[in-house]
Amino acid sequence: CDLATSDVFTVNVVADPVIDTQAIASQEVCRNTTVAQLEITVSGDNNTGAFNYQWFVNTTNTNSGGTLVGTNTNTYTPDNSVVGTFFYYVVINQTASGCEVTSEVSTIIINEVPTITTQPIGSDICLDGAANTLEVVTENGVGTPTYQWYASTTNTYDLTNPIAGETNSTYTPPTNTVGEVFYFVVISFDGGCSDIQSTIALVNTVAEPIAT
């Protein structure tokens, strides 16, 4: 029998897509504050179709499995409403070739918003007496808290009169002048949480009684 010869078949081997820029590795924010968008850049053979994206979130630090949370774009903005630690990654494929690549994990930590657990307490003090120290204690938040104490002659949050140099969690008011002064502190966090204010504490300095 004569030999039979098949038609020629061309097999085109192409490389998987390449992630040129990974998404931000980690970020830590307060609940309901801005989370930086996750973004990757990808390159590959343009003849094997458009890039398809599938973003996943995990509760463990792995780039497999998890819950599908976003598709069709190289960017994704993580949810900021639930406290916890979440791990995001994206799978990129080209449907014409079946080639795909998986990103590294981006860790997103959502912390509870800061609160003040100990508020400053006002008092009545005799002129030139030893004043009670005003103090605040906070919990939660992101980063190191910074403090600024304010004084006002009215029972309002007047931000026009910061007390110079008083940037700690405690403040001892002066008692060398008779009268009412209202104090409060504004606490800021370098991790992006919103500022919080203490309650207002009234320090009433009164004159010593005069014996007659």
Describe these PLM feature segments.
Residues 44-57, 139-151:
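Solvent-exposed loop segments of extracellular immunoglobulin-like
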Residues 15-25, 112-119, 207-212:
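Proline-enriched interdomain boundary motifs that mark the N-terminal boundary
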Residues 9-15, 107-112, 201-207:
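Interdomain boundary/hinge segments at the C-termini of tandem beta-sandwich modules
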Residues 56-81, 151-175:
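Surface-exposed, flexible coil segments in extracellular/virion-facing regions
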Residues 33-44, 129-139:
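A short beta-strand segment in extracellular, disulfide-stabilized domains
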